[in-house]
Curated annotation (Swiss-Prot):
Residues 1-558 are annotated as: Glycosyltransferase. It comes from Schizosaccharomyces pombe (strain 972 / ATCC 24843). It is found in: Cytoplasm; Nucleus. This is Trehalose-phosphatase. SUPFAM superfamilies: HAD-like, UDP-Glycosyltransferase/glycogen phosphorylase. Its EC number is 3.1.3.12. The lineage of its organism: Eukaryota, Fungi, Dikarya, Ascomycota, Taphrinomycotina. One of its GO terms (cellular component) is alpha,alpha-trehalose-phosphate synthase complex (UDP-forming). It catalyses: alpha,alpha-trehalose 6-phosphate + H2O = alpha,alpha-trehalose + phosphate. In the N-terminal section; belongs to the glycosyltransferase 20 family. InterPro entries: Glyco_trans_20, HAD-like_sf, HAD-SF_hydro_IIB, HAD_sf, Trehalose_PPase.
Length: 849
């Protein structure tokens, strides 16, 4: 970890942490008769809520803001009967159970929620997300960094809402996203997904507006989990400079599974508006990086992603932790000690206890555990009557509840108990609800084995809590190899939950383990599980994120070019020259080059710009002459250059002229055959041949594999062609070979020779081939006469608005306002003076001129 990331020094610049989660730490119920709110502490998400609570501790170095949805709200009546309106029970909830939550109810909720946290010694500003945020006229203030597009200040103004609205918003996350992240293909049809998506985007916008209305400069926004995937982008649209950190608590699937989502691009672009993205394990970060590369075609490394907006997003792993001191203290408390004694009297030392606690989701793996336990009793009969499995199941948050899993679980429990049970022995004890906390910690303290058999899972807190409670007993932990916890607790016994026989053998081995072996294993487990507390985890996460945000800012080597910087020199200039690259500069790079065509708006902008008698506008592209003529040939005022200058059509010239006659192209046959070898090895790639160049294009191939192939291909080509006067140009998704004579530096010098004296130069490009163009204009202020002296005597035919003998073409020693603009990331080595994030920003700038 970077220096200083362990402490609070890196994040000292942040005054507040705006913590954003789907729900508050409590479940809320509203009595429809008395209009009184009651809160019940959530039993799930203990690690998350414990970490969040530590931010509101009086000793925290930051002030805290808690942003969350109050729902789903339970409704109680005068007789205290509660009608659940949780999302997982939506199928059985009647409309009569829905009530209107008035502005007065919402104000009382805020007051009660603040009191709830203060009783727990938590000081934080509470921001409940009920629904749409009202806009009121904006007062002049420097207290918020809001983009110009936001003309009104956001203000939280309460409105009446129906309680059912609080459960509709996140249903897309529960019914679709959860499935995909846990390697399950969504079962909802397109129409159902479309309706859920509309609610999801609206719900996410409510969150964004509430955050914007409460944001202050100096805040760090910390967003939790997949339900809020869209939130970073929605915030970024209104707070362009806000530091945003996103932490995914769920697993992340492979790109092949993620691409099943119809809204895959929107979801990825939503979360990629964060500055920093953190996940539970290294494998999840690898899957995420691979998905961004394969689905969006973005450039990635093991630590960051370069987005299409020209920004860099840092990605790393940081596993959550439990509140170890609290759990350890609870296990040694008097109430828990009494429960431990009761359990020991029920289950004497000759009976071994196996404990499991799972939410009844489609990926919980409870049935796998039960089948493995049955295998144990079949193949190792000595344990009949001597081992008991205590299984606790609970309903999950959201729409992930599986009726099928519940039925299978109950049937298996009944089958095992009927096969192997007796009057004085029940092999499986199944609790359908969470236990009292004292009973739960007592059970964890006395159990000989804890078993996690999930078929997909992130960080399982029960496994961590079990280790924290076992310092005296030193029990064994069996983990599914598909659980994210397996990457942290390396001393646990890993099993494939689908292999029931091996699973049963592992249970038998743990039951027969010697005390010495148990102690040795547990010693390692203890160190791994208690290496940090939940407070230490979230502090480290914030400090690491703060360090990365600061590092990203320090890497910005070129300033952003704005309209205000450009407009004065532009208006003062008498003769202006524009040199514009095409792919990746004027238009976004596309996975298929035939899709990367200019928009009508761009063509109108270029025509208007080139029609100004003081402007000389050239488009410099590696595209073929045919493509340039087809898409931009109608704009006679434009100068066009194809294949890096092999052919040009000057402004107002009626025809193209070749600049690459009599070049040695004997190398093309060799390169073509060599590229064909890589086409056969790389499915989806192809060869694109032009008159004077040849390219191997791999934008439609597997991104990771094709990059590896490209590096190998380039290395071999450099050795093969070292005796030829050619240049090998690696680009974003292709590898091109062309004569050294043809490059943007040489073509720009010839354009300058023909254009004569200019006092304003604007050149823009996005990759290495454009650095030759930028190099021509070193230093920033150059002498026209000095530049022309270096230019080759070859001249282009054709004319612009003056002829070659005009006064405008006479070389003068004029100071030139030069703008070399890189399109894309700001921290790449470049000779440019400024940067613009993306082609659309360049298009907007040119349009405004």
């Amino acid at each position: 970890m970077p220096s200083g990331a362990q402490g609070n020094t890196q994040s000292a610049a942040y005054k507040r942490i705006v913590n954003v989660s789907r729900n508050f730490q409590f479940k809320a119920a509203l009595n429809k008769d008395t209009r009184e709110w009651t809160f019940q502490h959530r039993s799930s998400g203990t690690a998350l809520y414990s970490a969040i609570a530590s931010l509101g501790d009086p000793s925290s170095p930051w002030d805290a803001v808690y942003v969350a949805s109050p729902g789903p709200v339970q409704i109680s009546e005068g007789n205290d009967h509660t009608v659940e309106t949780k999302i997982d029970e939506a199928a059985v909830v009647h409309r009569s159970s829905s009530i209107v939550i008035s502005p007065e109810d919402q104000e009382i909720f805020l007051k009660k929620a603040t009191e709830y946290y203060r009783k727990k010694n938590i000081e934080a500003d509470i921001v409940p997300v009920w629904g749409k945020v009202q806009r009121v006229p904006q007062a002049k203030s420097s207290s918020a960094t809001i983009t110009p597009s936001v003309s009104n200040k956001l203000s939280t103004a309460y409105q009446s809402i129906k309680s059912e609205a609080l459960k509709d918003g996140p249903m897309y996350a529960d019914s679709v996203l959860w499935d995909v992240l846990h390697y399950r293909i969504p079962t909802l049809d397109g129409y159902q997904q479309h309706n859920l998506w509309k609610n999801f985007t609206r719900w996410s916008q409510y969150f964004a507006d509430n955050i914007v209305s409460n944001y202050r400069p100096g805040d760090l926004i910390l967003i939790h989990d997949y339900s809020l995937f869209l939130l970073p982008r929605l915030i970024r649209k209104q707070l362009s400079d806000a530091p945003i950190v996103f932490f995914l608590h769920a697993p992340f699937c492979t790109s092949e599974v993620f691409r099943c989502l119809s809204k895959r691009a929107e979801i990825l672009k939503g979360v990629l508006a964060s500055n920093v993205i953190a996940m539970q394990t290294d494998s999840y970060t690898r899957h995420f990086l691979s998905t961004c590369s394969n689905v969006l075609g973005l450039e990635t490394t093991s630590t960051h992603i370069d987005t299409s907006d020209g920004f860099r997003v840092v990605v790393f792993s940081s596993h959550v932790s439990i509140d170890v001191p609290r759990v350890y203290s609870r296990c040694n408390s008097k109430p828990v000690s009494l429960k431990i004694q009761q359990l020991k009297s029920l289950y004497p030392s000759d009976k071994k206890l196996i404990v499991g606690r799972d939410q009844l989701t489609k990926a919980c793996g409870v049935t796998h555990k039960l089948r493995a336990f049955r295998e144990l009793l079949i193949h190792f009969p000595k344990w009949r009557g001597h081992v008991v499995l205590i299984q606790i199941t609970s309903l999950p948050v959201g729409n992930n509840y599986s009726n099928e899993e519940l039925k299978k679980t109950e049937n298996l429990v009944a089958q095992i108990n009927s096969e192997f049970g007796s009057l004085d022995y029940t092999p499986v004890i199944h609790f359908h609800q969470l236990l009292d906390p004292d009973e739960y910690y007592a059970l964890l303290s006395v159990a000989n084995i804890a078993c996690v058999s999930s078929v997909r899972d992130s960080m399982n807190t029960m496994a961590l809590e079990y280790v924290a409670c076992q310092q005296k007993n030193k029990g064994s932990l069996i983990l599914s190899e598909f659980s994210g916890t397996a990457e942290l607790l390396l001393s646990a016994y890993l099993v494939n939950p689908y292999d029931y026989s091996r699973f049963a053998e592992t249970i038998n081995y743990c039951l027969n383990m010697t005390e010495k072996e148990r102690e040795r294993r547990f010693s390692s487990l203890w160190k791994q599980a208690t290496s940090q507390s939940s407070q230490q985890w979230i502090y480290k996460l914030i400090n690491r994120a703060a360090y990365e945000v600061k590092a990203l800012e320090s890497h910005m080597t070129t300033p952003l070019l704005t309209y205000n910087i450009l407009i004065k020199p532009y208006r003062n200039a008498k003769r202006r020259l524009f040199l514009l690259d095409y792919d990746g500069t004027l238009i976004e790079s596309a996975r298929n080059s035939i899709d990367a065509v200019p928009t009508d708006r761009l063509l109108r902008t270029l025509k208007r710009l080139a029609s100004d008698s003081r402007n000389i506008v050239w488009i410099l592209s590696g595209r073929s002459q045919k493509f340039m003529e087809e898409w931009m040939g109608d704009i006679s005022e434009l100068g066009l250059s194809s294949e890096h200058g092999s052919a040009i059509r000057p402004p107002l010239a009626g025809s193209w002229s070749s600049c690459a006659e009599n070049l040695d192209l004997s190398w093309k046959d060799t390169v073509r055959d060599f590229f064909q070898y890589y086409v056969e090895r790389t499915p989806g790639s192809y060869i694109e041949e032009k008159k004077h160049s040849i390219s191997w294009c791999y934008q439609n191939a597997n991104t990771t594999y094709s990059k590896f192939q490209s590096l190998e291909c380039q290395t071999n080509l450099e050795d093969m062609l070292k005796h030829y006067d050619v240049e090998i140009s690696p680009a974003k998704s292709f590898l091109e070979v062309h004569p050294n004579y043809l490059n943007k530096g040489s073509i720009v010098r010839r354009i300058l020779k023909r254009s004569g004296s200019v006092d304003f130069v604007f050149c823009a490009g996005d990759d290495k081939t454009d650095e030759n163009m930028f190099e021509v204009f070193l230093p920033t202020a150059f002498s026209n006469s000095h530049l022309i002296d270096e230019i080759d005597s070859t001249e282009y035919s054709g004319s612009h608005h003056t002829d070659d003998n005009s006064d405008a073409n006479k070389v003068e020693n004029v100071k030139v306002a030069t703008f070399r603009v890189h399109i894309g990331l700001t921290d790449k080595p470049t000779l440019s003076d400024y940067h613009l994030p993306a082609p659309r920003d360049l298009g907007e700038l040119l349009h405004n001129l």
